[in-house]
Curated annotation (Swiss-Prot):
Its EC number is 1.17.7.4. Its cofactor is [4Fe-4S] cluster. Coiled coil: none annotated. This is 4-hydroxy-3-methylbut-2-enyl diphosphate reductase. Keywords: 4Fe-4S, Iron, Iron-sulfur, Isoprene biosynthesis, Metal-binding, Oxidoreductase. It comes from Prochlorococcus marinus (strain MIT 9515). Belongs to the IspH family. It comes from the Bacteria.
Length: 398
């Protein structure tokens, strides 16, 4: 599939909009009214610290909405203002945040339904308005919407587009794309659609498994069974792992992505030698700045001698999950919640989601005496939600 030709056709159709409809000033004003918080602004100005009574709060120095998310949410809202009466669809949630998506639902912006991972575009009529979310859409979806003559509003984060360009470069030069990500995540599904031959690896353990195979250790049938849902059609590890390039889902843990990239470079050096490395490995730089900043800030926050840590963000948010992993790896009691309503002031309890688990209720969430609470939030979490959480902590400790 000539993905570049399809993109060019879509983007030059006259029914494609990547810039939005309002000025930056209008956009900032609209977002500020919905999602900004005076409390959070004052905490930022006070070196990200807040104290009241026995409660001390320390915010991460980088948290919450990133530029790409702000842009996507603002464009979605202004699309409804620009098209007040038209049917408006999204190919998926605009971002992984329940409050934002519920707000859009109340504005009658609908998500295209899916069953068993297959989207049903039959409800989308010719000329309808369709929003592509921050983590993008597959090239096949773009082509289908183009053929339906839909008005396409593309809010894809530029960092995600950069990954697409990377895997297209791999394809052009007949390199297989090794994608560090979750093979079912919406962003990785989109990236896969732009790649040629690809293999998705979730973590360093899977990278080591692939490396061992490249070096001649492993069983082909076992390999294909392990990666059956995470590789391109017709993938042959004996052929398609001779020339590889690395890319990533932008919300993965930065340190792990870097480690996987270096690991595969070392693997190809060992197999083919320094003189031939450029024929067998392509270096990469697709780590998102915002993801990197939030993870670095989290690594600093966990050194603040905290009693507990609250991580705020959608439960299906990959970047938020990785912030939670950092807390756990530093042995800090942490609680991942998506909305402030998970905290009960009356009962001093929190309903939170541990990694790889269902929601559980923690009673006596805030102990007696002085307490220092660290707080961070994922890139899809508005300041207002963080402020609501802080207000509940204040109420519990009064």
């Amino acid at each position: 599939m000539d993905t570049q030709a399809i993109k060019h056709s879509v983007q030059h159709s006259g029914r494609y909009n990547r810039k939005g409809f309002e000025s930056p000033t209008q956009r900032a004003k609209a977002l500020g009214e919905s999602y900004q918080s005076d409390l959070i602004a004052s905490i930022r100005e006070n070196n990200f610290s807040f104290e009241k009574g026995r409660l001390k709060i320390k915010l991460a120095k980088s948290f919450g909405f990133c530029w790409g998310v702000e842009r996507a949410v603002a464009m979605a809202y202004e699309t409804r203002r620009h098209y007040p009466n038209e049917d408006i669809w999204m190919t998926n949630e605009i971002i992984h945040n329940p409050s934002v998506n519920n707000h859009l639902s109340r504005m009658n912006v609908k998500i295209i339904s899916a069953k068993n991972g297959i989207k049903d575009f039959s409800s989308v009529s010719t000329g309808d308005v369709v929003i592509l979310p921050a983590f993008g859409a597959t090239v096949q979806e773009m082509q289908l919407l183009h053929e339906k003559k839909c008005q396409i509003i593309d809010t894809t984060c530029p960092w995600v587009s950069k990954v697409w360009h990377t895997v297209e470069k791999h394809k052009k030069h007949t390199f297989t794309s090794i994608i560090h990500g979750k093979y079912k995540h919406e962003e990785t599904l989109a990236t896969r659609s732009f790649a040629g031959n690809y293999l998705v690896v979730f973590d360093l353990d899977e990278a080591e498994y692939v490396s061992n195979y490249i070096q001649g250790h492993g069983d082909k049938n076992k390999f294909m069974n392990k990666f059956a849902k995470a590789c391109s059609d017709g993938f042959d590890p004996d052929v398609h792992l001779e020339r590889i390039g690395v890319a990533n889902q932008t919300t993965m843990l930065k340190s792990e992505t870097e480690e996987i990239g270096k690991f595969f470079e070392k693997t190809m050096l060992m197999k083919y030698g320094p003189a031939n490395i450029n024929d067998h490995f392509l270096a990469f730089n697709t780590i998102c700045d915002a993801t990197e900043e939030r993870q670095d800030a989290m690594f600093s926050l966990v050194n603040e001698d905290l009693d507990i840590l609250v991580v705020i963000g959608g439960f299906n948010s990959s970047n938020t999950t990785h912030l939670q992993e950092i807390a756990i790896s530093n042995n800090i009691e942490s609680f991942h919640i998506d909305i402030s309503d998970r905290i009960s002031v009356e009962n001093n309890s929190i309903c939170h989601k541990p990694l790889e688990s269902e929601l559980i209720l923690k009673k006596n969430f805030i102990p007696d005496g002085k307490i220092k609470v660290g707080i961070t939030s994922g890139a899809s979490t508005p300041d207002k939600i963080v402020a609501d959480v802080i207000e509940k902590l204040i109420a519990i400790t009064q």
